């Protein structure tokens, strides 16, 4: 073998080993996020699933039938863009909800991670058929805008991906009717933070309703918050960027239904 060939071989081996190290670190991060959503009561028993995009053809995901609070890196599976197994240790299979994750990645190339959980308050709103559309807190308006409810679908079938699909180009968080919540973003941490934000928003809305109903922000206040978001240059989809009424200079609010959230 020539010196040039040796150099190419060593370079290839370096990148291969580096990729393996990076994958292991990502697996550890997935386990950490799984522990967080479990400890915060966002999932029970074996509920929920998490995935991370490595590249256009490789994805890491949590296994089915395993508590997300007690995972270790060897639990994590690798699948292709069709959800087919590339690598999984004995006894582990990819989440049964992998179809939903793959639909998000297919229709949102900017997304690098997806988190699905069953947070108590957000899921309660999903069960009651009430979308999170009331502008009650600046942080929620800026970070989420509003959170629609995707129609009910049978878990592990194409029904949920089909139901979620219509909202993917407009929102970074969706409630799943009678099921839970789905968030996605440009990193695992950001996808998790969106799930936290959805649950916090839902909890505040629930509690304020118990106290006689929330005092909503005015349309002018919401418009100013939308402008702040634009100035921040925050990534992802948001009603501030796609609201049809807002584009026409008309009243833009969290339940005007021009974006399908109402």
What are these regions (language model features)?
Residues 8-262:
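Glycine-rich flexible loops
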Residues 3-5:
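Acidic, Ala/Val/Gly-enriched low-complexity intrinsically disordered segments
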């Amino acid at each position: 073998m020539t010196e040039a060939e040796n150099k190419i071989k060593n370079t290839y081996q370096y990148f291969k080993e580096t990729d393996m190290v990076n994958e292991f670190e990502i697996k550890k991060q997935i386990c950490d996020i799984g522990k967080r959503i479990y400890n915060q009561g966002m999932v029970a028993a074996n509920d929920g699933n998490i995935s991370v995009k490595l590249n256009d053809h490789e994805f890491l995901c949590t296994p089915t039938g395993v508590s997300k609070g007690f995972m270790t890196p060897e639990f994590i599976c690798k699948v292709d863009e069709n959800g087919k197994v590339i690598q999984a240790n004995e006894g582990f299979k990819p989440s049964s909800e992998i179809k939903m994750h793959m639909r998000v990645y297919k229709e949102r190339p900017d997304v690098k991670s997806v988190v699905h959980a069953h947070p108590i308050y957000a899921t309660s709103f999903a069960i009651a058929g009430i979308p999170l559309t009331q502008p009650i807190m600046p942080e929620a308006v800026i970070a989420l805008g509003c959170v629609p409810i995707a129609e009910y679908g049978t878990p592990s079938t194409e029904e949920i991906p089909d139901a979620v699909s219509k909202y993917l180009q407009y929102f970074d968080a969706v409630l799943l009717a009678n099921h839970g919540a789905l968030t996605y973003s440009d990193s695992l941490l950001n996808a998790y933070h969106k799930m936290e934000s959805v649950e916090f928003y839902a909890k505040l809305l629930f509690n304020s309703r118990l106290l006689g109903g929330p005092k909503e922000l005015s349309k002018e206040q919401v418009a100013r918050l939308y402008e702040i978001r634009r100035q921040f240059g925050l990534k992802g989809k948001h009603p501030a960027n796609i609201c049809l009424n807002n584009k026409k200079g008309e009243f833009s609010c969290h339940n005007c239904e021009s974006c399908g959230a109402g």
